[in-house]
Design a protein with these regions (language model features):
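Short, intrinsically disordered, charge-balanced linker/junction segments flanking boundaries
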Residues: 178-183
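Soluble extramembrane domains of integral membrane proteins
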Residues: 55-57, 63, 69-93, 99, ...
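Short, well-ordered alpha-helical packing segments
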Residues: 11-14, 30, 49, 86-88, ...
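Aromatic/basic-lined ligand-recognition segments
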Residues: 70, 88, 163-176
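Acidic, low-complexity proline/glycine-rich segments
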Residues: 1-10
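Aromatic- and glycine-enriched beta-alpha-beta binding-site module
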Residues: 75-137
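Active-site acidic/histidine clusters and adjacent loop/turn architecture
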Residues: 15-70
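Compact, glycine/acidic-enriched structural inserts
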Residues: 110-170
Length: 183
């Protein structure tokens, strides 16, 4: 199947499952899920496969490994809703655990879409390397950030930050936020 975009029916399914979040409703609408949600997401993964392979030839591209499951694990949560009202795709190096690995992601929800690159959870080793680079070569770090065109494309740098991390005196003000990032 060729990816032609996400149909309006994808978002409509997410809205419907939000308000009818039970197993009986899902089973009655499983065909809609397969057609309007799962098939477009799988086509999206296949469409992006060549680009992902050009970044890393060992990128995980099997749809069942890249696509989030609609069914939630509710064992340890107060919210026992069995289904998500959004889905995401993660592209990461095959065989790596999700936690701490570098990945590209895309999320579609009724409220909109998000996409980006980063890590899932903390990757202390990578962040320590970034901090050392900020101290040693702040202009080089600024140049890399500039080449990413973050501000021109309205992209945000997100993630949690250390609240009490001591930032060395030589770190420029515009890089202090980057230095304090946890992830």
């Amino acid at each position: 199947m060729m990816f032609t975009g996400f149909p309006e029916a994808t978002v409509q399914f997410f809205l419907d499952i939000r308000f009818h979040n039970n197993i009986a409703y899902f089973e009655e609408n499983r065909a809609r899920y397969e057609r309007d949600v799962k098939a477009p997401f799988e086509a999206f993964i296949q469409e992006l496969a060549p680009a992902m392979l050009s970044i890393d030839p060992q990128m995980e591209l099997r749809p069942y490994r890249c696509m989030a499951r609609l069914r939630r694990d509710v064992r340890f949560t107060k919210d026992k809703s069995p289904f998500r009202d959004h889905l995401w795709v993660l592209f990461r190096h095959a065989g790596e655990p999700r936690e701490g690995s570098v990945m590209y992601w895309f999320e579609l929800a009724p409220s909109g879409m998000n996409w980006g690159a980063g890590t899932w959870g903390e990757n202390r080793q990578m962040m320590d390397i970034l901090r050392r680079r900020i101290v040693a070569d702040p202009d080089g770090v600024r140049n890399v950030i500039k080449q990413c065109h973050l501000t021109e494309h309205h992209m945000l740098v997100g993630g949690s930050s250390f609240k009490r991390l001591e930032v060395p005196a030589g770190v420029p003000d515009d890089l202090k936020g980057w230095y304090a990032l946890r992830e």
